[in-house]
Amino acid sequence: MVIVDPIRVADEHWRTRGWDTGEHFAASLSIYRTDELIRLFDEVALHPHRLTRSRHEALAVLFFSRHGEIPLVTLSERLLVHPTSVTSTVDSLERLGYVDRVAHPTDRRATLARITAKGRRAMQQSCSIISAEGCGLAALDERQAVRLFNLLERVRADAGDIKRVDAPGGRKASRVEDPVLTAEHNWRAHGWAAGPFFRTALSIYRTTELIRQSNESALRPHKLTHVRHEALAVLYFSRRGEMMMGELGKRLLVHPTSVTSTVDTLERLKLVARVAHPTDRRATLARITMKGRRAIEASNDGMTETRFGLAVLTDTQAKAVTKILSAVRLSG
C-alpha cells in the first residue's frame, strides 16, 4: 500500500510554483497538523466538560495562578492570543460556571477572571485523562520527544517565548523564564504525569501560535487568518481550484460548521465563490476566484521570506522536526 503524505504533497506544490522554502514549509505545516491532531485527542477528555482547547488553556492558566485569578489582559499575553479572543473564551467559561468576572481591587479599569470550584473540578478530571494517555504523543518514544522539544525550544527562544531575567543590580542574567517548564512543574505539583510528552505537546501548541503570529504580517493585508489562508491554499493547489465543502473540512481537520463559517468569510472577501455541483444537486463546491489566487500568491511570498517563523532552524533541523512529527501524523 502506498502512503501519501499530505505534507510532502503540499511541499512539492509550493516548490513547483516557485516558492523555495527549503525544509521550513514542511516543518511549519507538520507542526500545525500535529497541533490539530493533539487538539482532536484532547477533545475526548475535554468534551464531557464542554471544554474546547482554547477554553481549557485559559482555565489552566487560572488554575495554576497563585490566587486563581488574573487580569484579562495578562491572560491574553499568557495564551499568545488577541484580547478579543480571550474575551470570547472567558464569556464561554463564565456561562459554563467555570469562571467568574470580578473587579480588580486596585485598578477600576481592569477586570479579573477567577476560576470557580466547578472550574477546578473540570480541570482536575480532564488533565488526569490527558496526562495518562501521553498528551497525544504516544507514537513517539522519549528520545524523540526530547529531541523535538529541544528543536522547538530554539524557535520559541528566538521568538521571545523564553526570556532571560536579569538579577537585581545589573548582574548577569540569573534565571530563564520558560512558560512550558513552569507549566510542567505545576502539573507535577498536582500529581499529574508530565515529563517529555507533556512539555513537547505544550511546545508544539506554543510554537504553532508563534508561527501564526509570524505569518500575520503577510496575511493581514488580504484580511486572511491562518484558517482562511489554509482553506484558500487547499483550493489553490487543487486540480480545478474547487472542492466539495465536506472534502475541504477533511483536508483541514476541522468540523463542517467551521468550514462553512470560513468559506462564508472568504466569499464575502470575494476570494472564494460557491458554485453548484455539476452532478449532485445536494452538494456545493467552493471555488477560488482570481482575487483569491492573487491573495495566496502575495501572502505566500511574504511567508517564504520569513521562513514561517522558523528561520532560526537550519534545513537539517527543520527536516528533523518534520521527520519526528511524521510518526504522530501517521498514527493519527
Residues of each region from the PLM?
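N-terminal leader segment of winged-helix/HTH proteins
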Residues: 1-49, 166-222
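N-terminal helix-turn-helix DNA-binding core of bacterial DNA-binding proteins
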Residues: 29-32, 40-82, 202-205, 214-255
